[in-house]
């Protein structure tokens, strides 16, 4: 449990690598995705190499739609027992990464958890991704996945890149408010 919690809450790459090894390596994780009904997402490398994302490279890829569908199925009880699902949702709500991404554009009274993804390496463009499960008061859960390619390389994730994802969440908020 502690490895999964660290991988989720603070994006601990070492913890994630240990979990991936326990699941049979990247191929084992990809096989699990297939078992869960995700025919798109694939894992091919360990951290930190999977953060090196080249435009035409299919390794370590997914789509926002595939990830949103998978997260919806995991977090709404279709794939996990209730206690495991509740534990994961708690970790997602306690996640310390991504506070300036999708979460920043959602109302504070919406119960929200997230998981970020970031790709950056010299010679590539920064990728700034986030997925949230959020519950507006009195409403059903909503899953939002947004992936942003900044078109540039910077040594750190820039707040202006994260702001694009916050704007996506504001648009969803306006849509939900109707």
Set out the residue ranges of the language-model regions.
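Secretory-pathway/luminal and periplasmic proteins that interact with or process carbohydrate-rich
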Residues: 13-17, 40-44, 97-101
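Extracellular/periplasmic catalytic domains that process cell-envelope and extracellular macromolecules
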Residues: 1, 34-35, 61, 106, ...
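Structured C-terminal helix/loop/strand segments within mature extracytoplasmic catalytic/sensor domains
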Residues: 69-96, 121-178
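Mid-domain, small-residue-enriched loop/turn segments at the edges of structured enzyme/sensor domains
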Residues: 1, 20-77
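Flexible glycine/proline-enriched surface loops and loop-helix/loop-strand junctions
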Residues: 1-2, 10-16, 47-55, 127, ...
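Short Gly/Thr-rich strand-loop-strand
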Residues: 98-119
